[in-house]
Amino acid sequence: MATPLFHGSIVALVTPMTHGEVNYEELKRLVEHHVQAGTHGIVSVGTTGESTTLSIDENVKVIKKTVEFADGRIPIIAGTGSNATSEAIILTKLLTNSGVAGCLSVVPYYNKPTQEGMYLHYKAIAESTDLPQILYNVPSRTGSDLKPETIGRLAEITNIVGVKEATGDLTRLPLIKKLAGEDFIFLSGDDATGLESMKLGGQGVISVTNNVAAADMAKMCELALAGKFDEAEAINQRLMALHHDLFIEANPIPVKWAAYKLGLISEPNLRLPLTTLSEAAQPTVLAALQKAGLI
């Protein structure tokens, strides 16, 4: 089977900010960093990119700037999710002809739709665009779980091409493959189980860890895709503390602080209601960076 466009180590990119405003010069440097490190794709303004605290205009500008900075060297996936179907459609349409390779759309959060509601939500979005759509299931944040059976139904829609599955439940992967078909792209949204999902046939990881360990994550995923799981596991074990401790507080709080400590961004700050990593948690994240050999 040919390698799909969306595969390997895909970074859920942080959005750098200075004094509360998006810093586009730093964003340009981050994109270049990932191109040079071998990252296989970038998710722009997903959860890690603080999509919920950016305005629609800011979302679109950050995504378009990311595409501009990438200059065709790496596929850009746009975070376009909303818990209002109409808003998700608006954001998706605003990216027509923008150069994005596809869209990542989170399960509607807070309002807890039924499985039929989720199906109709994604169907309406897909029918509004020609852009490839990736479903994003993260029940710990949304309060709703997109079931494998619903994913199977959605896979019948031509431009719904894959899923980011962030439950960490590896039993779902073979079931989703069975229901959605072997060509349906399965991307782990859980760094701690990402390599295990690739051993079971997943095509890659949409990764938070990649923000601070881009070259390692790219190499690990390349080894996994080549079936060299022992070598991939050696890298994975070195990064395992990061996989866990970058979630010691709500993402992207720890990873922004970690990126700041590594000099990748100039400020660790986020927009309210998110706050900078607490002093109590900082030694844990610092130790994880040390275990990974990054400092």
UniProtKB/Swiss-Prot annotation:
Pyruvate binds at T48, I206. The keyword Amino-acid biosynthesis applies. GO terms for molecular function: 4-hydroxy-tetrahydrodipicolinate synthase activity. The keyword Amino-acid biosynthesis applies. One of its GO terms (cellular component) is cytosol. InterPro entries: Aldolase_TIM, DapA, DapA-like, Schiff_base-form_aldolases_AS, Schiff_base-form_aldolases_CS. It is found in: Cytoplasm. Its EC number is 4.3.3.7. Pathway: Amino-acid biosynthesis; L-lysine biosynthesis via DAP pathway; (S)-tetrahydrodipicolinate from L-aspartate: step 3/4. It is an enzyme of class 4 (lyase). Gene3D superfamilies: Aldolase class I (3.20.20.70). Keywords: Amino-acid biosynthesis, Cytoplasm, Diaminopimelate biosynthesis, Lyase, Lysine biosynthesis, Schiff base. Catalyzes the condensation of (S)-aspartate-beta-semialdehyde [(S)-ASA] and pyruvate to 4-hydroxy-tetrahydrodipicolinate (HTPA). Belongs to the DapA family. Homotetramer; dimer of dimers. This is 4-hydroxy-tetrahydrodipicolinate synthase. It comes from Actinobacillus pleuropneumoniae serotype 3 (strain JL03).
